[in-house]
Amino acid sequence: MFDVDDSCLHEEDFLYVPEFRLYLESYKKANGTGLSRKTINRHMTNVMDFLYYSSTHNYNVDTEGPDEVPIDIAFLKRGNDYFSSYFDGWLLHNYESEDSIRQSVTSVKKFYRFLKETGRIESAVADHILEELKEY
């Protein structure tokens, strides 16, 4: 994980992180087993990286520069261009392997499923985003 400058982070940006950990701890795979602690920690690290990126690269859909506005759930509704800048741009400069990027995509998908299942994001929006994430 990279160094985090806490001065740019806002408490509300990471509001769902503790709940997401609980969600992962209760997650059951198709064979009925849960996720290992190592897998949960990897998902948490990947999602924290994604949220950090989102909080420091909060692009307004009408502009090409970062906003000064703290992020809220609206950043999670961004489209394919936003994911492209994260997965194809930022991650390629910070990870050495495509496997790491695939793992990050899987973690972000789990995070969106969590947001959908807990009613934090509308089902139609989450389904659309999850469909877009299939490209990665």
Outline where the language-model segments fall.
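Sparse, context-dependent recognition of short Cys/His-centered cofactor- or disulfide-binding micro-motifs
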Residues: 5, 9, 68, 118
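Short, charged hinge/linker segments at domain and secondary-structure junctions
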Residues: 60-66, 117-136
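Generic signal for short, ordered secondary-structure residues
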Residues: 3, 26-29, 87, 94
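Non-catalytic DNA-binding core/recognition domains of DNA-processing enzymes
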Residues: 33-117
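Exposed alpha-helical structural elements
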Residues: 15, 19, 82, 86, ...
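N-terminal "first-domain core" detector
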Residues: 8-52
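Residues that form generic nucleotide/phosphate-binding pockets
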Residues: 23, 86, 90, 132
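Intrinsic N-terminal pre-sequences and regulatory tails
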Residues: 1-10, 135
